[in-house]
Amino acid sequence: MVKLSIVLTPQFLSHDQGQLTKELQQHVKSVTCPCEYLRKVINTLADHHHRGTDFGGSPWLHIIIAFPTSYKVVITLWIVYLWVSLLKTIFWSRNGHDGSTDVQQRAWRSNRRRQEGLRSICMHTKKRVSSFRGNKIGLKDVITLRRHVETKVRAKIRKRKVTTKINRHDKINGKRKTARKQKMFQRAQELRRRAEDYHKCKIPPSARKALCNWVRMAAAEHRHSSGLPYWPYLTAETLKNRMGHQPPPPTQQHCITDNSLSLKTPLECLLTPLPPSADDNLKTPPECLLTPLPPSADDNLKTPPECLLTPLPPSAPPSAPPSADDNLKTRAECLLHPLPPSADDNLKTPSERQLTPLPPSAPPSADDNIKTTAERLRGPLPPSADDNLKTPSERQLTPLPPSAPPSADDNIKTPAEHLRGPLPPSADDNLKTPSERQLTPLPPSAPPSADDNIKTPAERLRGPLPPSADDNLKTPSERQLTPLPPSAPPSADDNIKTPAEHLRGPLPPSADDNLKTPSERQLTPLPPSAPPSADDNIKTTAEHLRGPLPPSADDNLKTPSERQLTPLPPSAPPSADDNIKTPAEHLQFRFHPQRMIISRDLPSVSSLPFHPQLHPQQMIISRYLLSICGFRFHRQRMIISRHLPSVSSLPFHPQLHPQQMIISRHLPSVCGGRFHPQPMIISRHLPSVSSLPFHPQLHPQQMIISRHLPSVCGGRFHPQPMIISRHLPSVSSLPFHPQLHPQQMIISRHLPSVCGGRFHPQPMIISRHLPSVSSLPFHPQLHPQQMIISRHLPSVCGGRFHPQPMIISRHLPSVSSLPFHPQLHPQQMIISRHLPSVCGGRFHPQPMIISRHLPSVSSLPFHPQLHPQQMIISRHLPSVCGERLWVPLPPSADDNLKTPSKRQLTPLPPSAPPSADDNIKTPAERLRGPLPPSADDNLKTPSKRQLTPLPPSAPPSADDNIKTPAERLRGPLPPSADDNLKTPSERQLTPLPPSAPPSADDNIKTPAERLRGPLPPSADDNLKTPSERQLTPLPPSAPTSADDNIKTPAERLRGPLPPSADDNLKTPPLATQEAEAEKPRKPKRQRAAEMEPPPEPKRRRVGDVEPSRKPKRRRAADVEPSSPEPKRRRVGDVEPSRKPKRRRAADVEPSSPEPKRRRLS
């Protein structure tokens, strides 16, 4: 037996029948009572639709569901309370209300005892709303005050339509008041003010805050009252005070108040007509917000987990046998089963990534080869669950037993040792999704041959797993790279092993060297000598990768099929190259509006950030890159070729178009990369690919992890395809920010490290032999720009570039820490030769060119919302970091800031005797002739940067060794800059066969001499025309040996120049003054650095001292009658007479004292 007791108030009964029915159904929906009985009760409410008494100040609805036994006491108490309230109301209402002044005073005295707040009646709601929570006015007081006013004014006020203003009571219905009306209103106003003043003093300070909060909550409830919600956890007092504030806001903001309401009190009347805003959600209690709103994803977030998980039906019984994975899998089913199968489910459901490992086979043969590598990668890291943040079980890579015959497998194993040995295996690689990495390797095949080492793991991982796309996320079939059988002779493996030695041998085993300054790692193998040794094996591989691909950039950029670099047919004896060749065919896949190619033997590619809302750009990373890290890529394609030990931390921000990422074979680790709405393909023999989280509310994406990938987790990839080829030791931290236009990035061969670089809307090209290119951040909302880094750059890190083209020529060990401050006019920055350090400088919209032989150029940040600019750093700069010390440039900061054209210091013609200068002179002529010296051409037209090499000299000496690779790179590709910037196919520089006599070492060392020696000290050559930077070296003189060529430049750059970044960072004029004051010291430094005293003074004389060459440089730089600009700069660097000229050029205004001040500072 169920009893239903309902106490109705006038405020509640003031609603219409439909609203009452809705409200009662909400309150009684949890009660199990007959529907017909409830309907009868609701239908009878219309009879009570009248304005009655206040029931003793208790205006709210009591709905009591009482059961026969345990609730009799409660029912009795409520009945007693109801009758007492009714009797009190009846007696008080019959206590003579004659409207006299004594009755009014008695009413206010009663208010002193019982009333702690005021009530107001809004014009649009016709309801009384308490000013603050818990304070009530007695019925006697209300009726006394109301009747007193109504008896005086009822005849004159029609239907309570009062248009009086709150602060001015001078009009009623648009008419002037009479003396009698004015007197009546003054009496009523005086009564209101007396009550207000009294209650202001009555309310203690501690209660005033609660009063204000209640007024705000009441106003918010009044605005959001679309229906009385069901509040199961609210107390009676709370529900009572929140009833009845539900009508929609009125069109007018006027409010009529009782005589008991003051003029300053009605905050509710002010807030009521306001439209519902986000502030209401913030200020309103969570119960009022969430209940009336429809169930959405926000309700799931804000509702406690018990409410979400309890009503959901349990998941279906797991198909697989109960295991450790089932524990995680069941929870995912409980959460995702009631939800619709959307793209968000794929993002948030780790069940798909949980690759349950297959049981290993009995004979432990070739798997031992992979096992050893896994141990090297995973051994130093602790097996704690924290390392494998979310699913460590999957990351537990149980190593396979090594294969018996150490043949071609050793070729892969050795590079892993070189790459992973010196670097510590950090737990960050397995950070967020260890479950996917827990790919327990399958048992090796019976015959432990060299082929089994590569093939058998693939069979173990792919054999037991179904070939469906769901297993490999969405398109596994494409990434299933079935390796070809290796050749019988294990000599080709030594060929791969030797490059690893070249890269790792001279460089320290420190992980930091690989991350930020891998230039030392950059030991790219030289072409082999006449007898075919291990170098020939590398050369053949390059032919396989570069030969079969078309030279069209569009094919590699937008057509993934073209990226599938189908290897050339192997030579007659099937060596280990055949094994690599097959994966190259499998590497080509789809990529969104951009593409990144990283070629073979790249130990690390990590941390490549790209900021959003930028124009398209390209990035290509070619062979022999030890490390590429810290780069973020938005909508671009990234291809990483063979021999990359690790690819990790590739985050991509959400809400981007689909993209693809392909990682080819023999990648020991690919971790920390987040991939959003794109397919990701990781090929065989990847020990770890981890931390690939997916953000919610994004479009569907695909992720494919091919065979033998222990783990792929924590990588974010937005709308771009990424391909990583074989034997890449590390490719990590490649975040991509959302809402950006397509872009491309190309990094050419032999780059030991490219890390931490952010690229905005520009194409970036990094050529061969760059040990490190890292930390190149680009801020968003900038115009398109281009960045080209030429050969032999040991390190390029930490540089932010805005909307400008950046060209870094050969043999630059490091370019770092060149910050640029925002909100500045366009300017240019030129760093000339022999600058020990230029770092920490802020540059806004200027062109900056970095030429050859710069040991370090790093941390070049550019602030957003700036016009396009260029950055040029000239040749032979040992270090450019953290300082503004400009030796060859004038000490005036204004010249570099606002007048970039003057900085284009076109080099003067060399002296009469054709010495090493002639070697520089010829490339400069070739570069200057076909390309215009306009900086705009470099910014928007990359074709100028495609410097087609000049024909070699007659005698094929060591120069031919350098010249031949240039022919291979430039010959098959068109000389247009667009091909290099946006067409990775052109970057596929297929090397020409080396000359017979010079040894492999001479091939690398001799170019260093040619690049170091023959380059002019003028920064103008590399300023605005990147084509000029493509300085194809002339054949060196006979006596100079190849070893001295490499060693001498390193000594000249590092020895005589101080590595202080502060000197070049903020005080370039000081550097200029010191250079001018210490003119004898500078030539001494050059002699110590170059080990050759005659060429150094010649360079300085040609660049700074000789006036005859300076006018010549002016003519070559501008190609226009703008000779005074180069004169100003050159004179600012060397001659005091030209310094005032520089001031004029910098400011374009007569502001010569400004550069003087800067020089003094």
UniProtKB/Swiss-Prot annotation:
<dbReference type="Pfam" id="PF06409">
    <property type="entry name" value="NPIP"/>
</dbReference>
<feature type="compositionally biased region" description="Basic and acidic residues">
    <location>
        <begin position="494"/>
        <end position="504"/>
    </location>
</feature>
<dbReference type="Pfam" id="PF20885">
    <property type="entry name" value="NPB13-l_MII_rpt"/>
</dbReference>
<feature type="compositionally biased region" description="Basic and acidic residues">
    <location>
        <begin position="452"/>
        <end position="462"/>
    </location>
</feature>
<feature type="compositionally biased region" description="Basic and acidic residues">
    <location>
        <begin position="1044"/>
        <end position="1054"/>
    </location>
</feature>
<feature type="compositionally biased region" description="Basic and acidic residues">
    <location>
        <begin position="960"/>
        <end position="970"/>
    </location>
</feature>
<dbReference type="InterPro" id="IPR009443">
    <property type="entry name" value="NPIP"/>
</dbReference>
<feature type="compositionally biased region" description="Basic and acidic residues">
    <location>
        <begin position="410"/>
        <end position="420"/>
    </location>
</feature>
<feature type="transmembrane region" description="Helical">
    <location>
        <begin position="63"/>
        <end position="87"/>
    </location>
</feature>
<feature type="compositionally biased region" description="Basic and acidic residues">
    <location>
        <begin position="368"/>
        <end position="378"/>
    </location>
</feature>
<keyword id="KW-1133">Transmembrane helix</keyword>
<feature type="region of interest" description="Disordered">
    <location>
        <begin position="278"/>
        <end position="580"/>
    </location>
</feature>
<dbReference type="InterPro" id="IPR054697">
    <property type="entry name" value="NPIP_N"/>
</dbReference>
<feature type="region of interest" description="Disordered">
    <location>
        <begin position="892"/>
        <end position="1161"/>
    </location>
</feature>
<protein>
    <recommendedName>
        <fullName>Nuclear pore complex-interacting protein family member B11</fullName>
    </recommendedName>
</protein>
<feature type="compositionally biased region" description="Pro residues">
    <location>
        <begin position="311"/>
        <end position="321"/>
    </location>
</feature>
<feature type="compositionally biased region" description="Basic and acidic residues">
    <location>
        <begin position="536"/>
        <end position="546"/>
    </location>
</feature>
<feature type="compositionally biased region" description="Basic and acidic residues">
    <location>
        <begin position="918"/>
        <end position="928"/>
    </location>
</feature>
<comment type="similarity">
    <text>Belongs to the NPIP family.</text>
</comment>
<feature type="compositionally biased region" description="Basic and acidic residues">
    <location>
        <begin position="1002"/>
        <end position="1012"/>
    </location>
</feature>
<keyword id="KW-0812">Transmembrane</keyword>
<dbReference type="GO" id="GO:0016020">
    <property type="term" value="C:membrane"/>
</dbReference>
<keyword id="KW-0472">Membrane</keyword>
<dbReference type="InterPro" id="IPR048893">
    <property type="entry name" value="NPB13-like_MII_rpt"/>
</dbReference>
